Amino acid sequence: MPIGVPRVPYRLPGEPYSQWISLDDRLYQERILFIGEPIDDSLANTIVGVMLYLNSQDPQKDIVMYINSPGGSVTAGMAIYDTMNHIKPDIVTVCVGQAASMGAFLLAAGTKGKRFALPHSRIMLHQPSLGTIQGQASDIEIRARETLRVKRRMNEILAQTTGQPLEKIERDVERDFYLSATEAQAYGIVDRVIQERSEAMAS
């Protein structure tokens, strides 16, 4: 049976009693985002909206994004990526569990020097997919060209964020490319493997 969104007690400053609010809302108050599911349009809209709100509240204070995701929609992930670069706060990214596909892309997109992985995290890169291509021959050709364009652009961004040569990125993502936390650090996807949250907050 689904348990729904967990709720936690929270007392507003100056109030004598606590009130129960959703765990997500409590994390947002601490400027913490958690991507803990496949990335789709609904999740992206929520994450984008919260980032815009936190930017308006304090454009100088870091936003921390925890990632435990198998990946998901390219367009949804790119909406999050563009917003990360659109707003002023630094984005601290932390992999817990796994960051695969678009999850790994967003992990690497955090602010340089503030990208972390917990010790037993797994990171996986591969080439993007825009879904099954069907329809008339002309439609298939258009979709195939778009897939190649998106693939090229994502590889270029990964080359920028990791410091790896574009040619190496293109070779590595042709098949599922798995890395441990320490391997992801050596590759340039994260800057450091950490044990405690305070290590990320002190970056």
Curated annotation (Swiss-Prot):
<keyword id="KW-0378">Hydrolase</keyword>
<feature type="active site" description="Nucleophile">
    <location>
        <position position="101"/>
    </location>
</feature>
<keyword id="KW-0720">Serine protease</keyword>
<comment type="subunit">
    <text>Fourteen ClpP subunits assemble into 2 heptameric rings which stack back to back to give a disk-like structure with a central cavity, resembling the structure of eukaryotic proteasomes.</text>
</comment>
<comment type="function">
    <text>Cleaves peptides in various proteins in a process that requires ATP hydrolysis. Has a chymotrypsin-like activity. Plays a major role in the degradation of misfolded proteins.</text>
</comment>
<keyword id="KW-0963">Cytoplasm</keyword>
<dbReference type="GO" id="GO:0009368">
    <property type="term" value="C:endopeptidase Clp complex"/>
</dbReference>
<dbReference type="GO" id="GO:0004252">
    <property type="term" value="F:serine-type endopeptidase activity"/>
</dbReference>
<comment type="similarity">
    <text>Belongs to the peptidase S14 family.</text>
</comment>
<keyword id="KW-0645">Protease</keyword>
<dbReference type="InterPro" id="IPR029045">
    <property type="entry name" value="ClpP/crotonase-like_dom_sf"/>
</dbReference>
<dbReference type="InterPro" id="IPR018215">
    <property type="entry name" value="ClpP_Ser_AS"/>
</dbReference>
<dbReference type="GO" id="GO:0051117">
    <property type="term" value="F:ATPase binding"/>
</dbReference>
<dbReference type="GO" id="GO:0006515">
    <property type="term" value="P:protein quality control for misfolded or incompletely synthesized proteins"/>
</dbReference>
<dbReference type="Pfam" id="PF00574">
    <property type="entry name" value="CLP_protease"/>
</dbReference>
<dbReference type="InterPro" id="IPR033135">
    <property type="entry name" value="ClpP_His_AS"/>
</dbReference>
<dbReference type="GO" id="GO:0005737">
    <property type="term" value="C:cytoplasm"/>
</dbReference>
<protein>
    <recommendedName>
        <fullName>ATP-dependent Clp protease proteolytic subunit 1</fullName>
        <ecNumber>3.4.21.92</ecNumber>
    </recommendedName>
</protein>
<dbReference type="InterPro" id="IPR001907">
    <property type="entry name" value="ClpP"/>
</dbReference>
<feature type="active site">
    <location>
        <position position="126"/>
    </location>
</feature>
<dbReference type="InterPro" id="IPR023562">
    <property type="entry name" value="ClpP/TepA"/>
</dbReference>
<dbReference type="GO" id="GO:0004176">
    <property type="term" value="F:ATP-dependent peptidase activity"/>
</dbReference>
